């Protein structure tokens, strides 16, 4: 029995559609592959970042009951490409703005996660992504979610390539979106 050509093409397309997307957008648990183990000593994290040749430390502030934090973990931070890019350029630390765990700030002062978020960094909403250099200086603050993994990668690139020195992220993002259209 001979299969008609259109049926062969349709079956091939179906097979490709069911196998290619999984390879193109591999997902991994952000707890294991995005965030790194830490004793919450940010001066130590900055030193590690410097020794590893990284830009600095990305501190992600979240809360347990934050739907936007969950959305970022489920749609962006779980992407292998995002995890690999950010781990290449930053030490990645997650802190809970409602947490009681102690954090040693870049200045060596030990405070609770809550105080570090609110008093030291004025984090009022989550998720908040604060990018620090290896000296503990704040480079970029981004609060909220990104549209998709590509936009979050643009945020990383914006910091890595120091575009923040001469333009706002909204302008950079608009330019990148226009270039990719």
Please give the residue ranges for each predicted region.
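Bacterial N-terminal signal peptides that target proteins for export
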Residues: 1-9
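Bacterial N-terminal signal peptides
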Residues: 9-18
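N-terminal leader/targeting and pre-domain segments
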Residues: 25-53, 168, 172-181
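Short active-site neighborhood of thiol/selenol oxidoreductases, capturing the structured segment around
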Residues: 53-66
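Hydrophobic beta-strand anchors of alpha/beta hydrolase catalytic cores
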Residues: 57-58, 92, 129
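Typically the conserved alpha-helix immediately C-terminal to a functionally engaged Cys/Sec
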Residues: 70-85
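Thiol-based oxidoreductase modules, predominantly thioredoxin-like and allied folds used
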Residues: 82-111
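Non-catalytic, surface beta->alpha helical segment in thiol-disulfide oxidoreductase systems
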Residues: 119-165
């Amino acid at each position: 029995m001979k299969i008609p050509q259109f049926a062969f093409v349709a079956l091939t397309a179906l097979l490709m559609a069911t196998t290619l997307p999984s390879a193109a957008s591999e997902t991994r648990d952000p707890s294991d592959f995005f965030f790194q183990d830490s004793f919450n000593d940010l001066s130590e994290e900055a030193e590690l970042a410097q020794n590893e040749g990284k830009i600095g430390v990305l501190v992600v502030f979240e809360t347990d009951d934050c739907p936007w934090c969950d959305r970022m973990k489920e749609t962006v931070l779980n992407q292998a490409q995002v995890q690999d890019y950010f781990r290449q350029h930053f030490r990645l630390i997650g802190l809970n703005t409602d947490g009681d765990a102690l954090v040693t700030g870049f200045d060596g002062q030990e405070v609770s996660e809550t105080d570090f978020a609110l008093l030291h960094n004025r984090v009022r909403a989550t998720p908040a992504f604060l990018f620090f250099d290896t000296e503990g200086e704040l480079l970029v603050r981004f609060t909220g979610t990104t549209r998709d993994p590509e936009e979050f990668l643009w945020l990383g690139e914006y910091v890595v390539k120091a575009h923040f020195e001469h333009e706002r992220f909204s302008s950079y993002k608009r330019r990148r979106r226009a270039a990719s259209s």
